[in-house]
A protein has these predicted regions:
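N-terminal helix-turn-helix DNA-binding core of bacterial DNA-binding proteins
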Residues: 2, 7-51, 73-83
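Conserved segment of winged-helix/HTH DNA-binding domains
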Residues: 11, 75-106
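Conserved phosphate-binding and hydrolysis motifs of nucleotide-dependent enzymes
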Residues: 24, 55, 63, 71
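Alpha-helical residues within the helix-turn-helix
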Residues: 43, 54, 60-61
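Beta-hairpin "wing" of winged helix-turn-helix
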Residues: 60-70, 77
């Protein structure tokens, strides 16, 4: 693998790694419905604002979400909604795995 190809796969891995946490997946699901402020998301996940802010920082650093500061509040939205297609694909894999396990259990 040459350096350019390695850099591309490293960048992809960073994005996938940013998604690899249940709380961040939940946040993504909520943001698919529209922008939310950190305080709303904190209530939804039953966590401190600081904890949710750290998760959002990971997602922002990966380029998945963008933020907009309005007064004392920070609102987040999906920067690239196409990432939801990837999450749909993950759900498809889960369904396929469940069917396979059911077949093996017969």
């Amino acid at each position: 693998m040459n350096a350019r190809t390695q850099a591309i796969f490293d960048a992809r891995a960073r994005i996938i790694k940013a998604l690899a946490h249940p709380t961040r997946l939940f946040i993504m699901d909520e943001l698919s419905r529209g922008e939310r402020c950190v305080c709303e998301l904190a209530k939804m996940v039953d966590a401190d604002v600081s904890t949710v802010s750290k998760h959002l920082t990971v997602l922002r650093s990966a380029g998945i979400v963008s933020d907009d500061k309005r007064g004392l509040q920070v609102f987040y939205k999906l920067r690239c909604p196409c990432v939801l297609g990837f999450l749909d694909c993950v759900q498809g894999v889960l369904k396929a795995n469940a069917r396979e396990h059911l077949e093996l259990a017969k």
